[in-house]
């Protein structure tokens, strides 16, 4: 498709209101580069727009000099979209276009985080504005401004409105190029606005931030609304406070309920087929049960959702099985069309020696089942190997014979198991794997006539996109011309070696078990009637992407595992998703993901509102604009801030801070769709804080060291003798070695991190803190009569008081603990004790 130019209205770079109308004549449109001009850039064309869902991504608030920034923002947005199922597998069911639009100024109206404050006078080509206006610091809905003053305050009577501008660009540019109506049901727009601030809104005219770390996730969430017809699952209408309880009636949303699992199963309604499954998004799929997931649909209580998390509740997670089942049906059925695309030989009578065909849209990672029958839908199955074309010449069928074909996407329980509803319907909430969104049939009658000979033709019509590499397990496909009297031939070569196709039009690369590296795949397409063969050539990316991690410095590593760090309260993780760029144009954007304690994969976007920041995990999370991120506590990483105050009896309560040991997995997904192998590490977070040093000792220390007052810190020190700590004094030992014994009587605090003590350790009567992490203690250890100050009241209230903290140490001698304020605790990182362990330490 050619790239067109000179589209849009003319407003002037600094104009506060538009002086033009949305019906401006095409010959008055400005040249590309002028304010309000536009151009359409195809990003992905997989088929006729009438047979696809078409996404048009529109740039707003980007000046002429910032168009490259919009292109980069859209690339990131789309690469994240293609990493999430079902978009990853059904990418070829979607066309994507970028509409570049030149704004007179940078950014949009009423951005609460704009430097210098929100600007009420800024006007962009699409009139986007943060709603409800410039006075709300938590504004996150970004809407097309209305001329009547709603949605940001255009002067009454000002024209055109944001919606008119939106329609203008579609009518004057997009619709003519795509050949579909500007209001077509299979046309989805997404306005990407130039801001680092989190925000967006749903509908068939969705919006999202271009620069926000979560911008691509906002648009996925909004597609859940507009494409998937899904409701919000979060527990509030206004962020700072819980939503009202749900009324005493069953919600209309297909993914909310007030029924118990038993009631749902008995009535065979909602998501009863998924009950009890481990959710893709965290937790176990439940209903309104004691262990169910209460709150959702902007209600704080008395309504239940299927899973602990999902992208419809907290951005970053994937759809759970219930949501994915509906999203895939909406994708394959072209939103409201309700039909899987299947161009074919026109139904009716066909020549007895002719060729009949169907053109299937190809999922990226699995084959469709194509079954040919003689005698109608219940007739004899022909052994065609899933061929898309059938030559009748060799079948010798009698005139009047009925020929039937079924194309089926095997999404049901016997295949992918993505759709468990067996219905034959295709409605929004009842689209089954036996329905027309996943199954299409065609039928012909064999006639008396023979097929006329046709001249040679260009054999290739389309195929898997060649402008980017294929994934190592992708199904490559070719779409050919369809002469009436013969079948176009397709031959495959991988790295110069002939390989057999999976069907007459496809090759499943996953069946070849490719070696690592970049390969070359060539399809040679030949018309038997003559003419030159045509070829399609792809790079095949068989290099798995990686996401190397960098963690903030720990107190120490567990003695038995150098990759298992221990931190007070929190730690940071930076991922650097990386892939081999061979075969790509430039350095591709690679998606990173991580998973906490097996609780659903989560998109790595850094940290909210902080450009290029690491992700912070902490015992109770960090609050950003009334939302919690990175919580290690009960209920998962993402929550509303008010949920952190919940106690027993509240939905999901009580909230318990996440001190203890956690497992974090992380991986990368490259633009080809390869999912790298996950790496993992354990991390232990303990309550407390490092002592602040009054005196620091490092290097060699000859003889015994006595700590008589204040806080003495040994940092990288080697003490040739023993160490003693007097009453009221404190000691912190970091990465040091003590050749003799360590004794403390009546000290305020004793902390050892990653250190070695060759002699015995005796700590008695400490008044505030005993914390020993990742250390090697070669003699006997005795902890007696110590008081451990509780660093987190909520944790101690719900999990019980803890005594001295002993985490991941290696103790060669005996370990004896008695008379402490509470039993010592290892917070999930056991100690290796060679000798006997007695008293309160018997379980360590």
Name what the model sees in each region.
Residues 25-179, 207-213, 413:
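Propeptide-to-catalytic entry region of secreted or membrane-anchored zinc metalloproteases
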Residues 344-360, 364, 413-490, 497, ...:
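Low-complexity, disordered linker/stalk regions enriched in Pro/Thr/Ser/Gly
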Residues 217-233:
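Active-site recognition of the HExxH zinc-binding catalytic motif
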Residues 687-844:
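Extended beta-solenoid/beta-helix repeat architectures
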Residues 1-18:
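Secretory targeting and sorting signals
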Residues 378-392, 496-509, 607-608:
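Surface-exposed, flexible coil segments in extracellular/virion-facing regions
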Residues 370-376, 492-494, 594-596:
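Conserved aromatic beta-strand anchor motif in extracellular beta-sandwich/beta-rich domains
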């Amino acid at each position: 498709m050619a790239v067109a130019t000179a589209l849009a209205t003319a407003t002037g770079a600094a104009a506060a209101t538009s002086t033009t109308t949305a019906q401006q004549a095409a010959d008055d449109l400005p040249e590309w580069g002028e304010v309000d001009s536009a151009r359409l850039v195809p990003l992905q064309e997989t088929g006729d727009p009438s047979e696809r869902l078409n996404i048009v991504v529109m740039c707003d608030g980007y000046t002429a000099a910032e168009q490259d920034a919009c292109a980069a923002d859209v690339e990131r947005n789309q690469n994240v979209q293609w990493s999430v199922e079902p978009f990853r597998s059904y990418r070829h069911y979607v066309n994507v276009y970028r509409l570049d639009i030149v704004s007179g100024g940078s950014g949009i109206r009423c951005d609460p985080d704009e430097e210098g404050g929100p600007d009420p006078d800024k006007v962009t080509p699409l009139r986007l504005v943060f709603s409800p206006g410039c006075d709300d610091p938590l504004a996150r809905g970004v809407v097309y401004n209305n001329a009547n003053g709603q949605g940001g305050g255009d002067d009454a009577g000002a024209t055109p409105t944001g919606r008119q501008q939106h329609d203008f660009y579609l009518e004057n540019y997009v619709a003519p190029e795509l050949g579909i109506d500007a209001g077509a049901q299979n046309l989805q727009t997404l306005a990407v606005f130039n801001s680092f601030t989190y925000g967006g809104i749903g509908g068939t005219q969705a919006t999202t931030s271009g620069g926000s770390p979560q911008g691509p996730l906002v648009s996925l969430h909004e597609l859940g609304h507009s494409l998937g017809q899904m409701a919000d699952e979060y527990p509030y209408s206004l962020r700072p406070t819980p939503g009202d309880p749900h009324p005493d009636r069953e919600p209309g949303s297909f993914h909310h309920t007030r029924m118990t699992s038993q009631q749902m199963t008995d009535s065979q309604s909602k998501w009863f087929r998924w009950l009890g499954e481990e959710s893709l998004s965290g937790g176990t799929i439940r209903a309104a049960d004691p262990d169910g997931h209460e709150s959702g649909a902007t209600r704080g209580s008395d309504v239940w959702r299927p899973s602990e998390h999902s992208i419809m509740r907290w951005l970053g997670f994937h759809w759970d099985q219930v949501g994915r089942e509906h999203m895939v049906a909406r994708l394959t059925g072209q939103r409201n069309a309700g039909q899987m695309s299947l161009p074919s030989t026109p139904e009716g009578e066909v020549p007895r020696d002719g060729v009949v065909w169907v053109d299937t849209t190809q999922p990226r990672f699995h084959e469709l089942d194509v079954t040919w029958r003689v005698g109608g839908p219940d007739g004899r199955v022909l052994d065609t190997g899933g061929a898309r074309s059938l030559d009748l010449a060799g079948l010798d069928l009698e005139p009047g014979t009925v020929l039937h074909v079924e194309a089926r996407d095997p999404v049901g329980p016997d295949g992918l198991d993505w759709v468990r509803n067996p219905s034959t319907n295709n409605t929004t909430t009842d689209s089954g794997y036996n329905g027309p969104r996943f199954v299409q049939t065609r039928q012909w009658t064999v006639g008396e006539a023979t097929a006329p000979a046709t001249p040679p033709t260009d054999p290739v019509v389309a195929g898997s996109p060649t402008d980017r590499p294929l994934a190592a397990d992708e199904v490559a496909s070719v779409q050919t011309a369809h002469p009436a009297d013969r079948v176009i031939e397709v031959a495959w070569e991988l790295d110069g070696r002939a390989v057999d196709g999976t069907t007459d039009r496809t090759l499943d690369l996953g069946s070849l078990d490719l070696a690592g590296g970049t390969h070359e795949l060539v399809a040679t397409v030949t018309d038997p009637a003559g003419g030159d063969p045509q070829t399609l050539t792809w790079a095949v990316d068989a290099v798995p992407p990686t996401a190397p991690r960098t963690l903030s410095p720990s107190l120490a590593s567990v003695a038995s595992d150098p990759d298992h760090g221990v931190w007070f309260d929190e730690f940071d993780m930076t991922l650097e998703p990386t892939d081999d760029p061979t075969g790509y144009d430039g350095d591709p954007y690679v998606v990173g993901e991580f998973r906490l304690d097996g609780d659903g994969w989560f998109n790595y976007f850094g940290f909210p509102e902080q450009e290029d920041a690491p992700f912070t995990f902490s015992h109770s999370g960090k609050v950003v604009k009334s939302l919690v991120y990175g919580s290690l506590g009960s209920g998962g990483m993402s929550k509303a801030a008010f949920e952190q105050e919940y106690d027993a009896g509240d939905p999901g309560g009580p909230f318990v801070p996440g001190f203890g040991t956690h497992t974090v997995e992380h991986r990368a997904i490259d633009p080809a769709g390869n999912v790298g192998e996950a790496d993992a590490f354990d991390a232990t977070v303990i309550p407390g804080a490092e002592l602040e040093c009054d005196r620091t000792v490092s290097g060699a220390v000859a003889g015994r060291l006595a700590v008589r007052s204040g806080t003495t810190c040994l940092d990288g020190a080697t003490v040739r003798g023993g160490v003693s700590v007097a009453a009221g004094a404190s000691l912190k030992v970091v990465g040091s070695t003590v050749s003799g014994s360590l004794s403390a009587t009546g000290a305020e605090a004793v902390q050892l991190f990653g250190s070695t003590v060759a002699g015995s350790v005796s700590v008695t009567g400490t008044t505030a803190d005993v914390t020993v992490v990742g250390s090697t203690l070669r003699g006997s250890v005795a902890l007696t009569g110590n008081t451990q100050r509780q660093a987190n009241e909520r944790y101690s209230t719900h999990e019980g008081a803890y005594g001295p903290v002993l985490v991941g140490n290696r103790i060669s001698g005996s370990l004896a603990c008695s008379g402490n304020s509470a039993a010592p605790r290892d917070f999930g990182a056991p100690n290796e004790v060679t000798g006997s362990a007695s008293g309160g330490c018997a379980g360590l």
